[in-house]
Every structure is written in structure tokens, then in C-alpha cells.
Amino acid sequence: MFGFDPSLITFTIYIFGMLLIGVLAYYYTNNLSDYILGGRRLGSFVTAMSAGASDMSGWLLMGLPGAVYLSGLVEGWIAIGLTIGAYFNWLLVAGRLRVYTELNNNALTLPEYFHNRFGSSHKLLKLVSATIILVFLTIYCASGVVAGAKLFQNIFSVEYSTALWYGAAATIAYTFIGGFLAVSWTDTIQATLMIFALILTPVFVLLSFADTAQFSAVLEQAEAAVNKDFTDLFTSTTPLGLLSLAAWGLGYFGQPHILARFMAADSVKSLIKARRISMGWMVLCLAGAIGIGLFAIPYFFANPAIAGTVNREPEQVFIELAKLLFNPWIAGILLSAILAAVMSTLSAQLLISSSSITEDFYKGFIRPNASEKELVWLGRIMVLVIAALAIWIAQDENSKVLKLVEFAWAGFGSAFGPVVLFSLFWKRMTSSGAMAGMLVGAVTVFAWKEVVPADTDWFKVYEMIPGFAFASLAIIVISLLSNKPEQDILNTFDKAEKAYKEAK
């Protein structure tokens, strides 16, 4: 297993490269602001690539291609919804959140921003929001651990229980050492590696056919064999089903690990440039992932002898294509892209979870006067604790990356998405409204499948839709029933809005 294996050598070089960046970032990390937000000094390119890489986890190279391989282009509605959601997140939220968090006592985390934005005399809002982050991000981290474990299990033929630790170890190490700067710098490299793999692989799958006519003919045979039209965007679904797939885009407004990239940018103007870079990267990556899943259908239909692994485990489709179509050295680089996707998102989520405990729980409730050095080291220790919990959740070998991501994505989108949007655009919003929105959104996501009868179409609706809608309604109703915010809060809101418009 550990002889002269080009894939192993490539992986090792890649991991050591990431660790080296972590060590370099260590020397730029002097205080908690550096560890959590990199001192708010990220440029447009790093912001764009870091936001993209921390967003598109192992789901991009495993979950989405696997879903398309299994069901066809109808799964592309997820990509359509995500693209629209990401664009409006950059357009509506990015610049405002950068300005508003800085003017609200230089808030370093979402819970701290909510607390400062609404001027709560008590810290219950911070406590509830930090708890929601820990619950859903730990589940989200588990999806990254599962993706990494399946990669190591496939490549090196080790037991899943062993692969869990291999997949998580490198990510934990450079996040522990370097904090936000390490995560952002490595994200930039990893985003480049991901787009390289996602463009190259579908092209080589197509080139494996004599011409497009042969490709089309084999695809038609594959469709006839299962009586399914893989190229139909509307096949085997309902309007509610399509809405559920497209509703993934709503989740962007509430993802802490993505919003942190906006907060860390050096200026609003750099965010405008970053939006163009990030959206271009995202469209190419999603198109490549869909292409991998779709083109793999006729490829493996024409080669049934090598299709066993993919037919049993569709999420392995990219891994199998990389191993089959490329020499071991190139395959090792391409497969490192999966590790890159896993590491980039997992590291971002570990850091947000760690900062939530350090800044919002420890400094907020236990030791308000803790030194910067103490807080940074506590943050590092919390990275280890959250990672251990994620590994424990990921113990089930049958866990699906897409399902874990789907649940956590809905949780954040419903609990935080409406609160973030209303906090930036409606100054009449109150702390009671924010609290109601968070709780209603989070509870809806957990309760939807338990309350709605399984034999109805509503059971199949993605939890994001009712969660986002009910949370928004709760914010409006409770805010209007509450006393108006204090004048200082209204003045800060106006000041932030003015600063944002001047900074554009």
C-alpha cells in the first residue's frame, strides 16, 4: 500500500505544501482578529478564491457528479439555484456586511455582529446564534470528513475507520497552526486545483469516444436501458421538486464560513472585483462537475467491466474517472483536487466553529478580559475538539456527503439567512425579531421531516423553503410587535449605510 505509488507521492507533496503555508501564516498571526479574520486585509483575488473554495466542498467533486450520474441533468437545478444565490449574496450582502461588522464594534463573528447590531442588553442572542453555528457546522464538518475518508479509502485501500483520520489530519494541522490566513492562502491554491480538475476531466471523458456521434449513440443506449432521459431538465420531478433543488441558492445568505470571507476583505471595492472573479470560477466549476456526471453515464455504460464501483457508489465517479483516464501522476494531481475541496471547506468550518466558542462563549461569558495569546491558543484547541466531534459523527461508512451537506446548508440558510438580510436592509428589525427568526428557522429544519406526513408531496420539499419562509415571517411579525430599536442603533445603521455607499 505504501510502496512507490505516484498518487501517494503527489498527495504527500500536496499536504506538506499546505502545512508549510500554515507555518508561514503562523508568523502573521499576532492576535485573535488575525486568527479569525486575518486582520481584515484580504485582497480581491484571495477573497474570491477563498470564498469559492470554502463554499464548494467535497460535494462539488463527489456529491454533485454522483447525483448527475444517477439522475441526469435534473440535478443541475441545484447548480442553477446556487449560482443565482451566490451572485445575490455577493451583490446584496458582501459589501454591506463588511462595513456593518466593522462599524458595529469591529465584530469578528456573526453572533458578535448580531449582538452589537441590535444592541442587546443581554447576551442571549449571541449565545443562541453561537449554539446554532456549533450544531450545524459540526454536521457540515462531518460531511467533509466523510468525503476525505472515501477518497483515502478508494485510493489507498485502507479501512474506512482508518481513512477518517487520514482525511482529517492534514486539514486540522494547518488550521490549528495558521488560522484564517493559512485557510485563505491555501484556499486560493486549492480553488485553482479544483477548477483545473473540473475542466480537464470532462474533456478527457469526451475524448475517450471516437466522436460526438458515438457519444450520443451510447448515451441513447444507456437511457433506453433504464428508460430515463438523462438530458431532460424536467424529467421525473414535480414543480415542488424543482423548487426544492433551486432553493439551495437561498442558503448562501446564512453560511458563516462564506460570510466570514466578506468580513475579512480589505475594502468594499475589492469585494466588487472579487465578485466577478468568484462567479466566473463558480460557473466553470459547476459546469465541469455536471459534465463529469453526465459524460460518465455513456462512458461506464460502454465499459461495464469497470463500472462496478461507480454503480455501487455514484459519489466515487470522479475518483474512478481520474484513475482510469490519466497516468498515475496526473491522476494524483486531479485526486488532490478532491482533497483540496475537502480541506478548503473543512478548514473554514473548523475555524468558524472555533471562533464561535472562543469569541462568543469564552470571551463573551467566561473570561471577558482574556489575553489575545490565551484566546488564540484556545481557538487552536477548539479546532481539535470540533474536528474530533465531526469524526465521531462521520463514523457511519454509509454516510452520504450530499445528504449531510444538504441538512447543514438548510440549517444555516434558514436560521441565519433571513436574519442577515433583514439586519442589513431593515433598520426597524429588533433583537427579539432576530431571536425569533433564528429559532423558527433552525427548529423548522429539524422538525419538518418529523412533522409532515411522509406520504405527501410536502414531505419531499427541501427544509430550506419552509425554514426560510417561516423565519422571515417571524422576524417581521415579532419586530413589529416589539418596541422600536433605540436611537443609537438607528444612527449606527444609517452611518453604516452611508459608509457603504461612499465606499462603493
From Swiss-Prot:
Keyword list, A-Z: Amino-acid transport, Cell inner membrane, Cell membrane, Ion transport, Membrane, Sodium, Sodium transport, Symport, Transmembrane, Transmembrane helix, Transport
Signal peptide: none
Superkingdom to which the source organism belongs: Bacteria
An annotated Gene Ontology molecular function: L-proline transmembrane transporter activity
Gene3D superfamilies: Sodium/glucose cotransporter
UniProt xrefs under CDD domains: SLC5sbd_PutP
GO cellular component, one term: plasma membrane
PROSITE patterns for this protein: NA_SOLUT_SYMP_1, NA_SOLUT_SYMP_2, NA_SOLUT_SYMP_3
One GO term of the biological process aspect: proline transport
Cellular location(s): Cell inner membrane
Pfam families in the cross-refs: SSF
Main location (coarse class): membrane
Keyword Ion transport: yes
Membrane-spanning residues: 8-28, 50-70, 73-93, 127-147, 163-183, 189-209, 240-260, 281-301, 324-344, 374-394, 405-425, 434-454, 461-481
Cross-referenced InterPro entries: Na/Glc_symporter_sf, Na/Pro_symporter, Na/solute_symporter, Na/solute_symporter_CS, Sodium:Solute_Symporter
Family: Belongs to the sodium:solute symporter (SSF) (TC 2.A.21) family.
Role, per record: Catalyzes the sodium-dependent uptake of extracellular L-proline.
Name recorded for this polypeptide: Sodium/proline symporter
Species for this entry: Haemophilus influenzae (strain ATCC 51907 / DSM 11121 / KW20 / Rd)
